Every structure is written in structure tokens, then in C-alpha cells.
């Protein structure tokens, strides 16, 4: 392997907007500021909203489901 071609791998602090901080190892070299983390993301907190796509399926079946082909 060649010497001195790889970037330095150092400890970095990732700070979320909610105030949570994480210690990571990275080649970036400076601290990270992120918008969401596992403490405030809706998927992990249980505040996720479910999208109902049943209306589209019903509309499709109403338009095309009644048509039958006879051979």
C-alpha cells in the first residue's frame, strides 16, 4: 500500500437541532450539524403519519375493474 494517501480519521461531534449530540469517527475533520436524529425523527418517535392510498386503488378498480375481456 502507498503511504500518506489516505485521509485522516478523527473523532467528530454531530449535533442535532433538538440538542442531541453524538460522537462519531469521520474523515470530514469538522463538527456536523444535522436537522434530525433518532431522538426527534417522526419514524422513531412514533409520530409518523400514515398515508391512505386506498382512494386511488378504489378509483382505479371503479374505472377499469368492471371491464372483462371475452375470448
From Swiss-Prot:
Zn(2+) binds at residues 16, 18, 37, 40. Binds 1 zinc ion per subunit. Pfam families: Ribosomal_L31. Disulfide bonds: none annotated. Its cofactor is Zn(2+). GO terms for molecular function: metal ion binding; rRNA binding; structural constituent of ribosome. Keywords: Metal-binding, Ribonucleoprotein, Ribosomal protein, RNA-binding, rRNA-binding, Zinc. GO terms for biological process: translation. The keyword Ribonucleoprotein applies. GO terms for cellular component: ribonucleoprotein complex; ribosome. Signal peptide: none annotated. Binds the 23S rRNA. PANTHER family: 50S RIBOSOMAL PROTEIN L31, CHLOROPLASTIC (PTHR33280), LARGE RIBOSOMAL SUBUNIT PROTEIN BL31A (PTHR33280:SF6). Belongs to the bacterial ribosomal protein bL31 family. Type A subfamily. Part of the 50S ribosomal subunit. This is Large ribosomal subunit protein bL31. It comes from Marinomonas sp. (strain MWYL1). The gene is rpmE.
Amino acid at each position: 500500500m502507498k503511504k500518506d494517501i489516505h485521509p485522516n480519521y478523527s473523532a467528530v461531534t454531530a449535533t442535532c437541532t433538538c440538542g442531541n449530540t453524538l460522537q462519531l469517527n469521520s474523515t470530514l475533520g469538522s463538527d456536523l450539524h444535522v436537522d434530525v436524529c433518532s431522538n426527534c425523527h417522526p419514524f422513531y418517535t412514533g409520530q409518523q403519519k400514515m398515508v391512505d392510498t386506498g382512494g386511488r386503488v378504489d378509483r382505479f378498480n371503479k374505472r377499469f375493474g368492471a371491464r372483462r375481456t371475452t375470448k
